[in-house]
Swiss-Prot record:
One Gene Ontology term of the molecular function aspect: lignostilbene alpha beta-dioxygenase activity
Described function: Catalyzes the cleavage of the interphenyl double bond (C alpha-C beta) of lignin-derived polyphenolic diaryl-propane type compounds (Stilbene).
Annotated organism of origin: Sphingomonas paucimobilis (Pseudomonas paucimobilis)
Name assigned to this protein: Lignostilbene-alpha,beta-dioxygenase isozyme III
Binding site for Fe cation: H167, H218, H285, H477
InterPro entries assigned to the protein according to its UniProt record, in alphabetical order: Carotenoid_Oase
Activity regulation summary: Activity is high with beta-5 type stilbene and minimal with beta-1 type stilbene. A 4-hydroxyl group and trans-stilbene structure is essential for the binding of substrates to the enzyme.
Pfam families xrefs: RPE65
Family assignment from sequence similarity: Belongs to the carotenoid oxygenase family.
Amino acid sequence: MAHFPDTSGMTGVLRPLRIEGDILDLEVEGEIPAQLDGTFHRVHPDAQFPPRFEDDQFFNGDGMVSLFRFHDGKIDFRQRYAQTDKWKVERKAGKSLFGAYRNPLTDDASVQGMIRGTANTNVMVHAGKLYAMKEDSPCLIMDPLTLETEGYTNFDGKLKNQTFSAHAKIDPVTGNFCNFGYAATGLLTTDCSYFEIDPAGNLLFETEFQVPYYCMMHDYGLTEHYAIFHIVPCSPNWDRLKAGLPHFGFDTTLPVWLGVVPRGPGVTNKDVRWFKAPKTIFASHVMNAFEEGSKIHFDTPQAENNAFPFFPDIHGAPFDPVAARPYLHRWTVDLGSNSEDFAEVRQLTSWIDEFPRVDARYVGQPYRHGWGLVMDPEMEMEFARGRASGFKMNRIGHWDHATGKEDSWWCGPQSIIQEPCFVPRMADSAEGDGYIIALVDNLITNYSDLVVLDALNLKDGPIGRAKLPIRLRSGLHGNWADASKLPIAA
């Protein structure tokens, strides 16, 4: 008989859902724009069995993939587990066999050496398939419409890297699926690789390189000619794992680096350029990056100190929720300079913001519009807890980098918002002309809605709201795919 622990990561809004099913034609308030024809896929961690350890991380849950199919002004819903090797063997056993988050030393002997991945962090459509991703394991292939799992892939044996980051980018010019993996040759190693997969799903090249130290390399930036990697000291070691401590811990004595890796075949580690930040800070996600002459601009929400209370300071310093608040910054480095120092660090917004997004047609290019989640602590909140991180993201924000204008929508006192996603109005619409879609979780009624807003007029509120008769667990990331990218029979 299953019984989940009475812990903060397994109760309340974070209580496991474990529901697979289909709902045809969701109830809608307002209107869903009829021209929206495609899919919004997103994923959340959702353990199918109680964890082996009561204090297990939220991020260790099995990947549950949600599909919202937009067509003819309607939205259909489907949800399935990503059937990883871990999921299958535990399903057969009827219990959890894999142990603590990213700690193989805590696994049951029967599964030692198996792939531990959960495919719970991001999902993207490419080459007619759905790539389900978790940064500590290979890419899991699923059908984008049925959500049936095909299995892990190493791209016909060509990809050497053992891991596959969840924050891949699709180059809007080439159509290549651009990604990387860290700890590429084994847990805690400093080996990484950057690689590109063509629009047909074939691996084009893989560039191997070394990073200054092993850390959580969760996201990266892509420009026309470079892949950009920030090294932030959310870093572990084997002593921590042997002691049963959380995999990652924040080390304020380590510097922050920004690595610039040229894109293309034949690149080696000696071609990589590293720049040092002026101080140690925290940064995880990336809004965008682009080139301007010899300079590279890298836009990321930056906090003055560790933003993850569940990965505590390794020196014992207490978590500081104010210093953990991220604000969008622009890091600039100059490839024309002989200095290893950043050329400039500049704050771009006044909002506490995270989960940044752009119009995907402008990834790696100079851009004007950005969106993200905002925590506004001055607004009324009728609930005590928010996301696993503790952040209570109650606004969707829009930033116009050309004018400095900021626009936002507040979701009300009972709700928090999951990561937004931009959808262009038409394939050839101007940058930013389109819609923002996002899940809104009402923490009082315990239901989730999918809202659609005008991307450049957020303050006007949702155009349409699809009402789910269930709550979806707090998710991580998701993406839109136009119907033209889906395996739909003519």
